[in-house]
């Protein structure tokens, strides 16, 4: 077969791509750092994170009580508060400073404060206040204390309304306290817990972040092992852009196709999270998401000079990226600039799409904006990766030529000296 024929070039390109794939795959399993980020972390970290929040809600949160009123009304409030499943009146303090000290020592996670005029204002028909102080270092305890206080206050308010209304029948009392009856039925997050709300987003983010860490660490290793500190080695197999890009991308796509199915199908089932995912939908959704993450990581790998650099580039972005998706913070309250900035990352559309698939049972046709955005990112980052690797290949060849010229000059100088 002639070397100039198209068929020969195609076969040779496929052969070189397979060689690059084999080399990169071998490096993934031989490099302990890459193996940890690409295999062990995606396997183990979701289990640990899901196990920690598997209870969904916290119960019997310790609370300090500062009752300066010492009245029947304040004791009724405290009794109802303590009877709730989510909170518990643990300590009774004589002052607010004493209660703050308990919070500082983490003996309690919140304070209920009743001023001295609490019962007096209620008897006068005036508005009375109950101070609720919460430790916001953990949102679950804050939620338990705050919502329990609100529920007890609403219950006591209903009793005050009934007394002041002076109704004659139970129906009059119902209309007074609840003129519009409604039933609160959670549709998607049926448990109302932290796990079902946040963990699906975290699982998708783990795919992107561990992939970026693994690709970046592998790139740093390649530079450190290269004599010229270049990302791409000078070899006959690394003679074309597409064979390099496809060979490297195929490695991470194969690894993370398995990890993606594990994170989106196996982990939610293990911990009984709400999951309405179907095989066909998640396969179609993971294809553009994983591809966009792979090409995004390969594009950024040119910035990594040393293995440790990738930790500085990737790790600190996890929490901001989660916020910018609109999962843990309302999207309407995120400034337009940061919303636009979040579109750079595949995790933004990946998390939004997966949450709708998992919690609402949406199909691909229902999440077309996110699905199209992921394919657009795949195309854009693929082209950007090709441009970056083209520049890296040119730089590697140039430095190799310069090194060869210097070596030849040194050999000639040695021959002249010897003669």
Language model: regions and residue ranges:
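Extracytoplasmic/periplasmic domains immediately adjacent to an N-terminal transmembrane anchor
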Residues: 1-196, 391, 397-419
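Alpha-helical membrane-protein architecture signal
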Residues: 14, 18-22, 196, 237-238, ...
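Loop-to-transmembrane-helix entry motif
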Residues: 28-35, 206, 247-253, 257, ...
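Hydrophobic core positions of alpha-helical segments in small-molecule transporters
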Residues: 37-38, 200, 246-247, 310-313, ...
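Hydrophobic alpha-helical transmembrane segments of multi-pass membrane transport proteins
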Residues: 44-47, 185-268
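Membrane-spanning alpha-helical segments of multipass transporters and channels
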Residues: 48-49, 91, 101, 254, ...
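Hydrophobic alpha-helical segments typical of transmembrane helices
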Residues: 73-77, 148, 215, 295, ...
């Amino acid at each position: 077969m002639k070397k100039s024929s198209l068929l020969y070039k195609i076969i040779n390109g496929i052969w070189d791509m397979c060689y690059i794939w084999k080399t990169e795959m071998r490096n993934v399993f031989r490099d302990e750092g890459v193996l940890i980020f690409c295999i062990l972390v995606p396997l183990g970290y979701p289990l640990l994170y899901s196990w920690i929040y598997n209870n969904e809600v916290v119960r019997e949160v310790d609370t300090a009580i500062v009752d300066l009123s010492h009245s029947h009304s304040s004791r009724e409030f405290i009794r109802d508060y303590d009877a709730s499943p989510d909170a518990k009146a643990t300590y009774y303090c004589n002052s607010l400073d004493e209660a703050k000290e308990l919070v500082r020592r983490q003996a309690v996670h919140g304070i209920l404060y009743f001023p001295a005029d609490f019962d007096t204002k209620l008897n006068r028909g005036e508005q009375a206040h109950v101070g609720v102080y919460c430790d916001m270092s953990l949102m679950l305890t804050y939620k338990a204390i705050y919502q329990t206080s609100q529920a007890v206050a609403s219950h006591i308010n209903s009793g005050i309304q009934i007394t002041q209304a002076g109704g004659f029948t139970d129906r009059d009392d119902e209309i007074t306290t609840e003129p519009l009856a409604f039933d609160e039925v959670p549709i998607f997050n049926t448990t109302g817990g932290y796990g079902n709300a946040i963990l699906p987003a975290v699982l998708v983010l783990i795919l992107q972040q561990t992939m970026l860490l693994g690709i970046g660490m592998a790139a740093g290793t390649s530079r450190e092992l290269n004599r010229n500190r270049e990302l791409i080695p000078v070899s006959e197999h690394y003679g074309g852009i597409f064979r390099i890009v496809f060979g490297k991308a195929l490695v991470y796509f194969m690894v993370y196709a398995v990890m993606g199915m594990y994170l989106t199908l196996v982990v939610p089932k293990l911990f009984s999270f709400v999951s309405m995912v179907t095989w066909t939908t998640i396969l179609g959704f993971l294809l553009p998401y994983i591809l966009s993450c792979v090409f995004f990581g390969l594009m950024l790998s040119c910035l990594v000079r040393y293995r440790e650099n990738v930790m500085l580039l990737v790790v600190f972005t996890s929490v901001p990226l989660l916020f910018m998706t609109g999962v843990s913070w309302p999207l309407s309250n995120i400034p337009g600039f940061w919303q636009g900035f979040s579109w750079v990352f595949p995790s933004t559309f990946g998390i939004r799409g997966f949450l709708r698939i998992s919690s609402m049972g949406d199909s691909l046709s229902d999440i077309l904006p996110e699905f199209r955005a992921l394919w657009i990112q795949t195309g854009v980052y693929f082209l950007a990766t090709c441009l970056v690797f083209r520049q890296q290949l040119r730089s590697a060849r140039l430095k190799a030529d310069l090194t060869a010229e210097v070596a030849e000059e040194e050999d000639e100088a040695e021959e002249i000296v010897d003669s």
